[in-house]
């Protein structure tokens, strides 16, 4: 009898998962930005805004009346997204600018152009990222994950920081991941030259996002600029394009994965919700403060990572 039941259960499993999917998805996609704040006259930059979570984040901010810059590597795709957002929201102040986070020259060029163009910056959302890339280096010789996900946004934030201070109250949102729990900052192997694993490299870079957020919050205390890191949830994303295994897993569990719109909610919560200033430096998931790993709470590592990052990017260490 048992021998007959097991094959039957295997046959029924896909059907049972399908039937349970709505409730499971509801459970996994909890957390909705409930803020009603409107943004007329506000200026926002969203990196990686031509797809996925970044696109949905930019769309909602445009819907609320902000002047939104889509900072993305693929300008042609960005222009198509900008037109889509303009049509959907009726907000024509959706602009596309070239930003390649794997090239510090591109980052500096973006910042220079933005600072010449705008008098204010109220929200910076560091959303762009890479995931599970085969070993490769940025234009400046950094390992791709740490180079794009951490160092690229570290430099961009520094270049725009004075504008954020001048525009205070203002906010910085860094998109991290639950994967940071598997991350470690190996200062002796920051560029992955001694040993490399694509999955772990992603985790390390997401840990770096949280450490950067916490150290930045300490340094910005009293400036009127607040900063938050977020875990968007497990989201349908182009980031898995480098891994056939992850693409297969995403397809297998597609019933349970958040949509990009759902994944954008925590970024929006941290960008918009009033009274969040006292929680600067915290990590959020599903629009609530979330627990982080022991290493992510290590102030000594955060300070050292700050100094090492400044040294790698040629920024003054203070």
UniProtKB/Swiss-Prot annotation:
Catalytically driven reaction(s): all-trans-retinol + NADP(+) = all-trans-retinal + NADPH + H(+); 11-cis-retinol + NADP(+) = 11-cis-retinal + NADPH + H(+); 9-cis-retinol + NADP(+) = 9-cis-retinal + NADPH + H(+); 13-cis-retinol + NADP(+) = 13-cis-retinal + NADPH + H(+)
Main location: endoplasmic reticulum
Residues that hold substrate according to the record: 177
Residues annotated with N6-acetyllysine modification: 112
Originating organism: Homo sapiens
Protein known as: Retinol dehydrogenase 11
Enzyme Commission code(s) on record: 1.1.1.300
Note: Shows clear specificity for the pro-S hydrogen on C4 of NADPH and the pro-R hydrogen on C15 of retinols.
Pfam families in UniProt: adh_short (PF00106)
Membrane disposition: Single-pass type II membrane protein
Entry's disease: Retinal dystrophy, juvenile cataracts, and short stature syndrome: A disorder characterized by retinal dystrophy resulting in progressive decrease in visual acuity and difficulties with night vision in the first decade of life, development of juvenile cataracts, facial dysmorphism, psychomotor developmental delays, learning disabilities and short stature. Ophthalmological findings include salt-and-pepper retinopathy, attenuation of the arterioles, generalized rod-cone dysfunction, mottled macula at an early age, and peripapillary sparing of the retinal pigment epithelium.
Tissue spec: Predominantly expressed in the epithelial cells of prostate, in both basal and luminal secretory cell populations. Expressed at low levels in spleen, thymus, testis, ovary, small intestine, colon, peripherical blood leukocytes, kidney, adrenal gland and fetal liver. Not detected in prostatic fibromuscular stromal cells, endothelial cells, or infiltrating lymphocytes.
Description of post-translational modifications: Not glycosylated.
